[in-house]
Amino acid sequence: GLQLTSPLLTAWWFLACSTNMALPPTINLSGELTLITSLFSWLDITVFLTGLSAFATTTYTLYMFSSTQQGTLPPNIKPSSPSQTREHFLMLLHLLPSAGLATNPKLTAPQ
């Protein structure tokens, strides 16, 4: 897969997928935990459906990552030039706000 052509971009893609799967310490994890605890006061079926949707999201994200990054390179994709620093800087700028909110959730609270 694409891991053979750009291993560092694969690492960035894995970090983005991990954030989507609500792995600790991401802001998605705190959101899903808050949602699930608030659903305990409702019907039991809502907790089950929320857990099922979280499982489906995680399964789809893992499938998407492994199908694009692992295995052999498809014949229609030609290896490209190595990634530039600006692409890695752009990925860092996308993940820094999420990391900042995960480490300090009070950043979103009004003063």
Curated annotation (Swiss-Prot):
Organism the protein comes from: Caiman crocodilus
The gene coding this protein: MT-ND4
GO annotation (BP), single: ATP synthesis coupled electron transport
Keyword Metal-binding belongs to the record: no
GO molecular function, one term: ubiquinone binding
Protein purpose: Core subunit of the mitochondrial membrane respiratory chain NADH dehydrogenase (Complex I) that is believed to belong to the minimal assembly required for catalysis. Complex I functions in the transfer of electrons from NADH to the respiratory chain. The immediate electron acceptor for the enzyme is believed to be ubiquinone.
Pfam families: Proton_antipo_M (PF00361)
Keywords: Electron transport, Membrane, Mitochondrion, NAD, Respiratory chain, Translocase, Transmembrane, Transmembrane helix, Transport, Ubiquinone
EC identifiers of the protein: 7.1.1.2
GO terms for cellular component: mitochondrial membrane
Top-level division of the source organism's lineage: Eukaryota
Protein family according to the UniProt entry: Belongs to the complex I subunit 4 family.
Catalysed reaction, written as an equation: a ubiquinone + NADH + 5 H(+)(in) = a ubiquinol + NAD(+) + 4 H(+)(out)
Transmembrane segments: 35-55
Protein name, per record: NADH-ubiquinone oxidoreductase chain 4
Membrane topology annotation: Multi-pass membrane protein
Localization annotation: Mitochondrion membrane
Keyword Nucleus annotated: no
